[in-house]
């Protein structure tokens, strides 16, 4: 009888741990998704107004369509896990908007190897990386900026590479960011440079 009691207690404890881990993951994902910058929405809508006022209705339509599709995937009915194809489509809409806002200072290429679009990923995992690439590199480009996204297989894993030809970061900054023991200063800013 005591063995059954112990097994039952262990099952309850394991269930509690699994539930707590799921709640933790859900909270972390909510924080990530809340980082969709509201300024992005405001600035995009301001751009649409400006385009419309200046008779550039075709461009305004392209931007609004991309924005609607961007948010359709962002909100995707509460699902936090989406196919890689949807994540890449989300990135495509984000880049369409940003290329228009930044007056085509950069080009973007999105490529997926065969068979990598159907596995699932955490939603909105690429967009913050693109945001960093644009704000810290492409904003200063002179029409020669390039951002490349490649979804590829590496054994059983799917890797999504995001590269750009921006100025990058000094090697010592990269090493410090990757060092788990490095002291962290709270700068109040989001993202890496």
Where are these predicted regions, by residue range?
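Two-component histidine phosphotransfer core
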Residues: 1-36, 40-192
């Amino acid at each position: 009888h005591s063995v059954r009691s112990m097994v039952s207690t262990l099952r309850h404890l394991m269930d509690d741990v699994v539930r707590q881990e799921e709640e933790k993951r859900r909270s972390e994902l909510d924080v990530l998704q809340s980082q969709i910058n509201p300024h992005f929405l405001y600035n995009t809508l301001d751009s649409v107004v400006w385009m419309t006022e200046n008779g550039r209705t075709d461009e305004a339509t392209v931007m609004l369509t991309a924005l609607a599709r961007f948010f359709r995937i962002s909100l995707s009915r509460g699902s936090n896990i989406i196919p890689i194809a949807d994540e890449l489509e989300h990135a495509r809409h984000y880049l369409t908007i940003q290329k228009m806002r930044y007056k085509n200072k950069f080009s973007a290429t999105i490529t997926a190897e065969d068979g990598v679009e159907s596995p699932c990923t955490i939603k909105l995992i690429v967009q913050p990386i693109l945001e960093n690439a644009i704000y810290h590199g492409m904003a200063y480009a002179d029409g020669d900026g390039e951002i490349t996204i490649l979804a590829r297989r590496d054994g059983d894993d799917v890797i999504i590479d995001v590269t750009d030809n921006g100025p990058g970061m000094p090697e010592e900054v990269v090493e410090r960011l990757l060092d788990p023991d490095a002291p962290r200063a709270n700068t109040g800013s989001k993202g890496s440079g």
